[in-house]
Each structure stands twice: as structure tokens, then as C-alpha cells.
């Protein structure tokens, strides 16, 4: 039986495990908003390892995502509509190894393995750095280089729609601030052409970065993802979501996303989608 047959047969299991969070050491349980200017009070129950915040463009999805990230990491910045609010009245309950803990902007220590990830921004930084330093001086002196394993290559090919003979990753450090970033070299099947990150289209480059990030993320992490649909066609979005479900299940991740794409939302249950809207002068959030 091929890897593709096995993976496709188990996709329903991955999504079920995302929904029921069986054997997860970390479970985000609830989000509470009380007495916060500009916001209606809300008590939101979170029942899935994958939660998406949706709403129209410009409504503040990113601000809310960054605020939740900031409360858990204690790195609160660029929170937009919340910047002048009393954010200490926003609390998040998480079960960690069977024990419930409450986090606010001032309560609880910053958690390990909490990351905010925006593939589009990372892709832009990488391309800008390539344009600034086309010879890539010092990039590969201490970089970690490897080829993606077949089990990951299956998903890469399905998501990008390309048949790669191999995907080589160089994890580059010490070039862009404290950011570790991937530099790719790929070869397509039945082709003599080898090309690298700077020769890729925006969609292909962003997808490879997003896939790399999920492979690179440690087990039992909490990952915040900013609009994964940007520059990506609907079919790739759907296949990316299947890979995300596979990764959440195998690594026991908690993932929160901001999105306005129906293709990103469609495989998720209604109880895993939070709707951000504006009612009069106040914002509302509901599921």
C-alpha cells in the first residue's frame, strides 16, 4: 500500500483527533472577555485543537490573534483595536498536563513553545534579504541542511501540485535578527532543472515555508497562524488544511488562526470557528 493511500485513508482520523483532542497534554479551554471597552462581554468555550477566528477584512482578526498570543507568551505588542483597552480583563483557561491554569496579561508566566507565525511576512523578509545579499555570504556556514522525508514529501507534492524528486532545506540562522528561516532547493521529477527559493512563485515559496514551519514546530506547542490562504489557490488551501490536521494530531499541537477563507474554514467543525463582528460601536465574538 502506498504512502498516499495510507495518508488519505487516515485523514478522517486526523480531523477527528483534532476535534476531540484525545491524548493532548495541552488544551486551550476558554476565552473570557469582561468589562473591556469596545467589546461586548463574552465567554467562549474552545473544544478543538484547531480554532479559527473569522470575520470581514479589517475587522480586527489579527489584533485578537496577537492579543491571545501576547497573553500566553507575555509578549504583547501590535494588538491594534486592543491597544487602548483594559486587556487585563481578558483571560484564557488552559489545561496543562491535567491542571487548569488561567492566564491574563499580568497573571501567569509566559508559556514555552508559543509561537506566532506569518508565512507571507517571512517569505517577504527572506526575498528582501536575498535581494540585499544575492551572494548569500555566510548563509550556509552553520546552516542545518537536510532533505524532506518521503512522508512529508507526499504532503508537499499534494499541497503545491508539483512532483518533486527532492526538497532540500537549509535552515539559516544569524542573518535576519534572531529568525531561523528556510532556504529551499528543489528538483522536479523527470526534469534536469534545479531551482531555489528566489526562483519560486509567491504561492510555492509561501507554501514550502508554511509546511517547513509545521515540520519544525516542537511537539505540544501552541501555534498562532496568520491568514494561511494568502497567495494560495483553493485546492492548495484545502490540502494544506489536511496537512495541518495531520501535524496537529501527530505533534499534539494547539493552533489558532486568523482567516477569511471559506476553503480554510470548510473542514472545521462549527464549534471550532470564532466569528468576530462589530455591533454598533462594540465588537462581538461568538462561536
Please tell me what each predicted stretch does.
Residues 258-260:
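H-loop/switch region of ABC-family ATPase nucleotide-binding domains
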Residues 75-162:
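Nucleotide-state sensing region of NTPase/ATPase domains
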Residues 200-225, 234, 238:
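GG-anchored amphipathic helix commonly corresponding to the ABC/SMC/Rad50 NBD signature/C-loop
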Residues 239-244:
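Conserved hydrophobic alpha-helix in the ABC-type ATPase nucleotide-binding domain
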Residues 47-81, 206-213:
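Phosphate-binding glycine-rich loops of NTP-binding sites
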Residues 15-65:
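Pre-Walker A-like glycine/lysine-rich segment at the N-terminus of P-loop NTPase domains
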Residues 265-287:
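RecA-like P-loop NTPase motor core
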Residues 2-17, 125-202:
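Extended helical coiled-coil dimerization/tether regions that scaffold
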Amino acid at each position: 500500500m502506498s504512502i498516499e493511500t495510507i495518508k488519505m485513508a487516515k485523514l478522517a482520523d486526523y480531523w477527528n483527533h483534532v476535534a476531540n483532542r484525545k491524548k493532548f497534554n495541552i488544551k486551550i479551554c476558554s476565552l473570557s472577555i469582561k468589562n473591556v471597552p469596545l467589546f461586548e462581554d463574552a465567554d467562549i468555550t474552545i473544544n478543538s485543537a484547531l480554532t479559527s477566528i473569522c470575520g470581514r477584512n479589517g475587522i480586527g482578526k489579527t489584533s485578537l490573534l496577537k492579543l491571545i498570543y501576547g497573553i500566553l507568551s507575555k509578549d504583547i505588542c501590535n494588538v491594534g483595536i486592543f491597544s487602548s483597552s483594559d486587556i487585563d480583563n481578558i483571560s484564557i483557561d488552559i489545561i496543562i498536563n491535567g491542571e487548569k491554569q488561567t492566564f491574563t496579561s499580568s497573571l501567569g508566566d509566559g508559556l514555552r513553545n508559543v509561537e506566532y507565525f506569518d508565512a507571507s511576512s517571512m517569505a517577504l523578509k527572506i526575498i528582501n534579504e536575498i535581494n540585499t545579499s544575492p551572494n548569500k555570504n555566510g548563509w550556509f556556514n552553520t546552516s542545518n541542511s537536510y532533505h524532506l522525508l518521503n512522508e512529508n514529501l507526499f504532503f508537499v507534492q499534494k499541497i503545491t501540485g508539483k512532483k518533486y524528486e527532492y526538497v532540500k532545506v537549509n535552515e539559516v540562522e544569524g542573518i535576519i535578527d534572531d529568525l531561523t528561516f528556510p532556504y529551499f532547493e528543489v528538483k522536479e521529477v523527470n526534469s534536469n532543472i534545479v531551482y531555489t527559493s528566489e526562483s519560486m512563485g509567491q504561492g510555492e515559496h509561501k507554501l514550502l515555508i508554511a509546511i517547513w514551519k509545521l515540520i519544525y514546530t516542537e511537539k505540544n506547542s501552541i501555534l498562532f497562524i496568520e491568514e494561511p490562504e494568502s497567495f494560495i489557490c483553493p485546492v492548495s488551501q484545502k490540502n494544506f488544511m489536511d496537512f495541518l490536521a495531520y501535524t496537529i494530531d501527530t505533534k499534539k499541537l494547539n493552533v489558532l488562526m486568523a482567516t477569511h477563507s471559506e476553503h480554510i474554514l470548510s473542514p472545521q467543525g462549527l464549534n471550532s470557528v470564532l466569528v468576530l463582528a462589530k455591533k454598533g460601536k462594540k465588537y462581538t465574538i461568538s462561536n
